[in-house]
Amino acid sequence: MSNNNNRASIYGGLGSVGKIFGAPLLDVVMNQKSKTTSLNSSSSATNNNNSTVEEVNIPLFLHNGFKYIIQHGLGIEGIFRIAGTKDKVKQLQMQLDKGENIDYDASKVDPVDLADLMKIYFRELPDCLLQSDQYDHFISLLTLDRLGQIQKLRELVSSLRPENREMLKQLIWFLGRIAVNSTTNKMSEENLGLVWGPNLLWKGGKAVSTTDMMELMAGAGKIKLIVTLLIEEQEHVFNNLNATITKGEMKVSFINKIVGNKKTCQGISIIEDGESKSIWTADSAGIIKVFNADNYVTEREWDSNLGRIHTMTSVRDHAWIASSQSVSLWNKAGNLVKEFPGFHVSLTPVYSHGEYRIWAGTDQKITIFSSNTLEIVQTISIPGQFIVSITEIFGESNQVWVGATGGQIIIFDKTTGEEIRKLSTPAKRNITCLTFHKYMDKGKVWAGSEDKLIFVIDPFDDYSIVQTVSHPDLLLINTLKSISKSVWSCSRDSSIRIWDSNSFELLGSLDDYHTDAVIDAILTYNNRKMRWEFWTASFDKSVCIWSVSSELLSQPPPPLLNV
């Protein structure tokens, strides 16, 4: 990803910060900060604002390493339990101690080797991260009940040296992302506590003698319980656990990445009724996976036998799936309700005739299905065009916009299905996605293209393009989502970009966790954690979850229960 390459080159100047392994944590962090200040001063003097280096409060190789393992290592069974290749791990350690900056992606570092190196780093600290003078206090908290343990953990963590506290917070946050994927990597909170405990807490300074090791082993079971508790209860132990990525009024934080798909994710939808809500994903091999929307647990998965799935959408508690062989309807229990033969690639619910109707696009036609009668109610012929994307224009316009090949957009009356007009954009290739966004005005249509451009169009007055949005790293636009006073674009370059809907400026970019095209996304409210979350599905066979906070995003009303 180009953003990662730029970041690697910027951080490259931070290489020579002195010895890392065996050095006090504070020394490493302070040397790093000094180097950062020097680099930023040089950039300012040359007016090179693009080379500003973000200040990192933990050793940089760990900061980057956490992201690298989240990108490439979450699905490795036994990550942190299995040993790395001894010579490769030693080579990495020597490079870092010589002050070399390691680009993990360019060097194709094995995540297992990096995981092993991380444990070595903490094991070689002059004093353990949890501080040996606090050993007895940590051990004694195990005599308390669960609530008392959490309260005591908060106190003890707060009393740690600032550099230790920050390092512990980021390490435990990272280990939590590993544990979320324990069904795939077999590294539960308990297993992580077992392998990490001896590296984080020991008694009497550095564990180098036989006596030290014997004492360490004697307390290993208790230390495992402490680290397990830290991982399980991290949201109650640490403040500001999830770092904010964006700036301004809207706050976005990375929460989790969930791996385990065998093929590329093709679609993601919310399936809900008055009692429950789940997130469905579909991959290119036809596998449907269902997650609990509140705790992210994988509830079930199955082979739909649909062939290659292209996209999916939902109406309440039913999923509609477009595949190489059909459009199919599934209930929340995962049962096939009905299947309509025929290849389709785009699906959108449109409210008309007192119900939601599914508009499905394919080669030279649109098929419209009733979600009430489960029948085809209309077929619209569009000779010479392939229908790639569809969106409804909310309000009084009564329009549906359709993105096609050759940069064409076709506008239909959503009640009659009659064509209203055609628009030609500057795009030479497909209009890959469309969304209607309304904030403090009548609204505008955002149209993403295969030409790496986004066109913002007035759908009410003269149908003119009011703005063309671009970015040097932007590739094919896969989906656009309207959130608050912004529009989010997901593209083939693996980044999610957030655009201000009035100024069209880039508010932020979510870069570090997907490694391939982001194909689809949904915004949902987590009732358990009481926050809005943005779920993204990617060709890297994973989904990522981000928390979204904005004063314009209010808590939704409670669902109406069936009585």
From Swiss-Prot:
Domain (Rho-GAP) ranges: 51-238
Q: Which SUPFAM superfamilies match?
A: GTPase activation domain, GAP, WD40 repeat-like
Q: Which UniProt keywords apply?
A: Cytoplasm, GTPase activation, Repeat, WD repeat
Matches recorded under PROSITE patterns: RHOGAP (PS50238), WD_REPEATS_1 (PS00678), WD_REPEATS_REGION (PS50294)
Annotated WD repeats reside at 260-301, 303-340, 383-422, 470-509, 514-556
Q: An example Gene Ontology cellular component term from the record?
A: cytoplasm
Name the site position(s) for Arginine finger. Answer: 81
Which GO terms fall under biological process for this protein?
A: small GTPase-mediated signal transduction
Q: Which top-rank group of organisms is this from? A: Eukaryota
What is the stated purpose of this protein? Rho GTPase-activating protein involved in the signal transduction pathway.
Q: Which PANTHER family match?
A: RHO GTPASE-ACTIVATING PROTEIN 68F, RHO GTPASE-ACTIVATING PROTEIN GACX
Q: Per its record, how is this protein called by name? A: Rho GTPase-activating protein gacX
Q: Which organism is it from?
A: Dictyostelium discoideum (Social amoeba)
Q: Which gene encodes it?
A: gacX
